[in-house]
Amino acid sequence: MVSKVLVCALTIIAAVSCKPVCVIEGNLTGMEGDGWIYMVDAWDDSIVIDSTRYQDGVFRFEVDAAEPTMVMLTCNELPDPRLHRFFNDAGTLSLTGSVEVARKAQVSGTPLNDALNDVVRQMDEYYAESSMVKRQDRCMELFTEELNGNSGNALSLNLIEMSVQGMHPYV
C-alpha cells in the first residue's frame, strides 16, 4: 500500500514538474573556433535569456518555453553581433545558415517559426521586385493578413511590435 502511494506521488510530481522546453540546435558557417553565443530578448537585447559555447559554428540551447517569445541570437566575436530572430517555442528547432547572411538563416521545427518564416519569405519576395512605396504597402498588407490569421498568438503580437517600430523581421 505504501509503495503504491509513493509511486502515485512520484508520478504526480513528475507530471507537474514537466515544463515546455525549446531546444535550438544551430550550425552557422563562418564561426570558426570556439566562443560564446547569447540568446537575448528580441525587443531588449540587454536581457540575456541564456548563453552557450559554440565550436566551429555548432551550438545547442535548451531553454524554458512556457510561453513563446521572440528572441535573438547574438555573438560578440562577430562584426555584426546580431544573428537571427525567432520564437523560443516548445519543440526542437534547427537553425542553419551562414554568419555572412545570418538574418536569413533557416529556422524550422515549430509551427510558429514556420509561420514567421512564411511571412518573411513573402515580404522578401515582394521586396525584391517592387518599388519602395509598393514594398511598404505590400508589407503592411502581409502584416494585416497574418495578424488576422493569427489573432492573439505570439506571432501576431510580435508582428504588431515590429510594425510599430518600423522593423523588418530580420532587423
Label for each model-derived stretch:
Residues 167-171:
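Charged, long alpha-helical assembly modules
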Residues 120-124, 151-166:
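Amphipathic alpha-helical repeat scaffolds of TPR domains
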Residues 1-28:
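Bacterial Sec-dependent N-terminal signal peptides
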Residues 18-146:
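A non-transmembrane, solvent-exposed segment enriched in polar/low-complexity residues
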Residues 10, 49, 138, 151-152:
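Generic detector of ordered secondary-structure context
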